[in-house]
Amino acid sequence: MKTLLLTLVVVTIVCLDFGYARTCLKTPEVKSEPCPPGQEVCYTKAWCDRMCSFRGKVIELGCAATCPRQEPGKEITCCSTDDCNTHP
């Protein structure tokens, strides 16, 4: 009986991924990092500032609990797999 119980405990630990955290690309360095607990959405925000005609749109990449709200003048896209918010 103890052997069966021990086997079930080991199988449970192996099957459950206790330390999993979503990873998203984050700015300013544009590198993959684990998201804080509860933040399972990766997002990309893009917008023009006064330097847009010279250097292109400003890009912000990160994690969120939910997809950020649309804002005037900002393009926001969201996804929910690891590192899915690639730089446009």
Swiss-Prot record:
Keyword set, alphabetical order: Acetylcholine receptor inhibiting toxin, Disulfide bond, Ion channel impairing toxin, Neurotoxin, Postsynaptic neurotoxin, Secreted, Signal, Toxin
Protein family per UniProt: Belongs to the three-finger toxin family. Long-chain subfamily. Type II alpha-neurotoxin sub-subfamily.
Position of the signal peptide: 1-21
PROSITE patterns with a match to the protein in the record: SNAKE_TOXIN (PS00272)
Location of the protein in the cell: Secreted
Function: Binds with high affinity to muscular (alpha-1/CHRNA1) and neuronal (alpha-7/CHRNA7) nicotinic acetylcholine receptor (nAChR) and inhibits acetylcholine from binding to the receptor, thereby impairing neuromuscular and neuronal transmission.
Domain of life per record: Eukaryota
Organism: Demansia vestigiata (Lesser black whip snake)
Matches recorded under Pfam families: Toxin_cobra-type
GO MF, any single term: toxin activity
Disulfide bonds: 24-42, 35-63, 48-52, 67-78, 79-84
CDD domains according to UniProt: TFP_snake_toxin
Organism classification: Eukaryota, Metazoa, Chordata, Craniata, Vertebrata
GO CC terms in record: extracellular region
Tissues with expression: Expressed by the venom gland.
UniProt-recorded name of the protein: Long neurotoxin LNTX-1
Keyword Secreted carried by entry: yes
Ribonucleoprotein keyword on record: no
